[in-house]
Structures are given as structure tokens and as C-alpha cells.
Amino acid sequence: MSPAGKGPAWRQPAILAAAGAAHALSFAPDPLPAWSLAPVQVIALAVAAHASLQAPSARRALARGWLFAMFSFSLGLYWLYVSMHDYGGLAAPLAAAGVLALSAFLALFPGLACAAARWLCPPHWDASPPARARRTLYTAATWAACWAALEWLRAVVLTGFPWLNIGYAHVDSPLAGWAPLLGVHGMALLAAFAAAALAGLWQSASGRIDSRQALAAGVALLLAGAGWLLGQFSWSRPEGKPLHLRLVQGNVEQSQKFDPALLETGLRRHLELASLPPRPGEPKPDLIILPETVLPVFQDQLPASVWDAWIEVARRADTRIAMGVPLHTQPDGATGHRYTNSVIGFDASTPVEQLRTGTTAMRYDKQHLVPWGEYVPPGFRWFVDMLDIPLGDFDRGAARQPSFDIAGQRIAFNICYEDLFGPELLPALQDGPDGRPGATIMANVSNLGWFGNTWALRQHLQIGRLRTMETARPMVAATNTGITAAIDARGRVAAALPAGRAGVLPVAVQGMTGLTPYARFGDKPALALIGLLLIAAAARGRRPRQP
């Protein structure tokens, strides 16, 4: 019997809940192996597609899609409980309620997608045998377009939270070859099409596979094959010599990181790791990169001796240092103050006064801030006050900021979950209006210690891998507790440190130049394709329907 077939009232909700839970496992290779993520994602989503398309009404389709997504988000984002309860100090029932409330909101987007697709694709019209192939192809394309459109809306509504976009389940699948052209939203469209095509193979009326309904599945296989071929193409070319980097993972326990009594301990650990001499045969680093908020207080709250110690590290190693630090600055001629979550770069020649005032030449200010963690949305001060989260209410950085020029390479930094928003990374890779060339390397600094050693770390690494595929640029990630890694321009993890362990990762990273179609146009091609499919679906929906 099909998931949408007759049976006890509890059967279909149970199947959708189980499929949603399985779907949550497909976004990072933990606990499932990497090769299984894409098949699990497509099969699980096919259950939701079939159930929603066979629903008796659009309202019932919304409920079925919402239930599936509710279980997917609740399990896939369980690590938010760790942040709110273990480190935010929120009572366990309230932390659990927070995860469920967010999941319920996020699940509205897939639910609405299922409702829209069901409204555009009634289950039993135009069902004559000659028309079945056309109908299943149309239905699969329409369902996929609705799903991908709502994935995109989830990425932009209320600052956006596109975590667990289904495209990330396909980093190691043939569909990844489409990333340089269509980005994650285009991959989501193709993955949703594959799921809907699989759902179309199952004919609920007879319980048998109907060969007439295999056209959409055949198209899905062709798209996967084309993705594999596209994946063989090189979209960028090397520029300059490889850059030697040292990535530092301090592994400072989150419960201790912002404790004033333990501030010196954390600083000393990072100083020691940054000061380690190169191993035998290992070249000296051109740049040492430390994670987000290595200094857990504003830079002007530290004595000059702390900055003297860091300058001494740069002097002894004959290198430059980039570190995440919260900055308190007062722009020239301004009466107000700015507070930013930033990365600063310096070397042995940098005056201490520049470091204490936050006026170093190399600086990046985070532009996409975390709601409740880095700024307070209107009406939610009460919620933030319940959490023990320091360093809130930051100011935003500019959309395009200068790269860090190091040894012939240009590094574009991003902080925390900014690498989740692919279009916002693109201005730094493109040539500036002043003719300044775009970045050749991307670097993410983050502190995922808020989430413990959970799926969040592996999911974040998958997100970074897809950004490199979209842009054909390498990316390095320096994190507090993991996963510190180097990813090449094809999305392959070249080196990584185990999570939950202090250490340094010496890597040689080859900078790349040249723009992929996605790096040039961002989400526009994918959105245009989604829009055309929706327009075609709406136009077909107005035609007279056969009984």
C-alpha cells in the first residue's frame, strides 16, 4: 500500500514523521555515510511528495507537508537546544519549546509548497493512458518548482535561515555538478524534481509501477548524468603560488569562553598554538588564522600588554595574523559608537594603538548578523534577556569590503553562518567598481562551541563545501571547537582537524581566479527557471481538465 493509500488514520502521519526524521539525517555524514545522503534525501522527500500530491485538498497537502518538515527540522536542528539550554541557561522545557517553535515556523514553507503544488496538480485529472507521461512530468516539475521557490523564500524572509536546504544533501552526488551554474537553490529544484519523479512512479490506484509514469524519472536521471559531466569541468584557474596558512583551533569550552576568571587561560592557549614552530620540513605560515571572538571582550578593554604579546608572535614567526574579535570603534567625525563582530589582520609592524582602537588596515566586519545572538529583533528583548548570551546588538558591516592581501593572494573573510548565504559572498569575489580584483580564497572564522560536538559542525562543513563548488574558490575554516578544515575549489576537504580537540592545521591553499556563472549572476538563473516553471504551471492550471 502506498503512503497515501487507505489504512488506519495513524498510518500516514506515522509514515510522514518517519520520513521527515530520515530526511534530517541526509544533511551531513553523521551518522549516515556520505554516499547515502543523496539517496536518503530523495527517497524521504518522495514520501512527502506522494502524500501531498494525493491529498484530497490543498489544505490537507499543507498539513502533510508541514508534518513531514516539522519532524525533519526538529531533528535536524536539535543542536539549537544545546545552545539555548547548555550554554544559554534556558530551562530545558523552554529550550525544547524554542526548537519546536522555530521548527514549526520553518515547516510552514515546505507545507505551503506542498499546498501550492497540490492546487496546481489535482491528483486524478487528465489521467488517460496517453497523457500519463506528460502529466507525471508536469507534476514533478511543478512540485519541484513550488518546493524550490519556498526554499528560496525561507532564505530571505525575516533575514533568512536556509539551513537544511535540500541542496546540501547533494554535495557528494552528481547534482553537485550543477552548483557552479545554478547554486544551492537550483540544486534544490533538481533534487525536488527527482523526489517528485520517484513519487510519480508509484501508482496509488493499482499499487503497481506504471511504465508510462517513468518519463519524469528518466529526465531526473538525465539531469543527474549532466551534473556528473558538468562536474568534470574546471570553472577557475590557479593564480599565484599556494598560500601557506596555519589554522588554529583553540577548543575553549563554551561555558568557559566568556568567563572573566578564565579569560587569561583562553588567551594563553591561543597564543601558545599560534606560536608553535613549524614542523620539520614545513614552511613558515604566510598567515595565521584564529577563530571568531578569540578575544571574548572588546579590543579596547584589553591592556596594551596583550596586544604586545600578539605582535611578538607575528614578529617571531615573521608572519601576519588574522583573528576574530569584537570591535568597539568611533568613526572619525562621528559622535556615536560602532560595535562589530570583526576579523582584524596585523603583523609585527602594526602599532599597538591601531589594534586597541580597531583601526587596522586589514579588517572585515560581519554583515549578516544572527537574530537574538548578535542583534535583537523588535519585540524580542524579553527572549534575549532570558538567555545568557554575551556581546549582543552589533552593527552591520558593508556588503563589499576589501580583501586581505597576503603573499599575492586575496582572502575574503566571512564570519559564523555568513557562508550560509551564498549571494552575499559573491561581491568579494567579483572585481570592485574601482577595478580592484576579486578574492582568490575564502576564509570562514566561527565559534560553533555554542552547539557542542553535534551535527551542527558537520552540517556547517557541508555548507562550506557547497560554497566552494558554487564559486570555484577554495575556502578555509578556522573554528573554536571544530571543524577546522581546508576545502579545495571543487568542494573536497583537503585537510581537517577532529572536532573537540585543540590543535593547529598547516595547509597550503592554491588561490583561484575566474568566475563561475553562479559567481557572476548569483541566484538569478535558478530563480528565473523556477519562475518559468511556476508560470507554465499556472497557465496549464487554467486549461479545462479532463475527467
From Swiss-Prot:
Q: What is a single Pfam family found in this protein's UniProt entry?
A: CN_hydrolase
* Predominant location category: membrane
Cellular component aspect of the GO annotation = plasma membrane
- Where, by residue number, is the active site? 292 (proton acceptor), 366, 416 (nucleophile)
Localization, UniProt: Cell inner membrane
- Segments passing through the bilayer: 31-51, 65-85, 89-109, 144-164, 181-201, 215-235
Question: What's the stated role of this polypeptide?
Answer: Catalyzes the phospholipid dependent N-acylation of the N-terminal cysteine of apolipoprotein, the last step in lipoprotein maturation.
The protein, known as? Apolipoprotein N-acyltransferase
